[in-house]
Amino acid sequence: MGKRCPCGTGLTYGECCYRFHSGEWVAPTAEALMRSRFTAFAVGNSQYLLDTWDPETRPSELGLDMGIDFYRLDILETTGGGPFDSTGTVKFQAFYKGLASGVQEEDSTFRKVNGAWVYSTGDVD
């Protein structure tokens, strides 16, 4: 918990995304949810990923490739997704290494369901 959070805020995991993962906090914006979901990939928390996935697009199960290490997130653009919005998009780059190394760029769409931000869909470049 004392290590720097993978989402890139500069805070420790315990001060940052762990609070979302533990249920102590709920993401106030689409970008905050994106950061917490990236960190969930980085720490292997598939349950959080499923819990924050839009019920209309959520898979029944999610298998994470533990051979991939997600180590850096760059937020490129955010549209909407604020506390008073109902939808938003976040364009980001996720850097990874492992059996293969590279960067995945994605435009993700988020919406609020019962007042909470959820991930709906993503277009991978």
Swiss-Prot record:
- A Pfam family cross-referenced in the UniProt record is YchJ_M-like
- Matches recorded under SUPFAM superfamilies: NTF2-like
Family from the record: Belongs to the UPF0225 family.
- Full protein name: UPF0225 protein Cgl1438/cg1626
What organism is recorded for this protein? Corynebacterium glutamicum (strain ATCC 13032 / DSM 20300 / JCM 1318 / BCRC 11384 / CCUG 27702 / LMG 3730 / NBRC 12168 / NCIMB 10025 / NRRL B-2784 / 534)
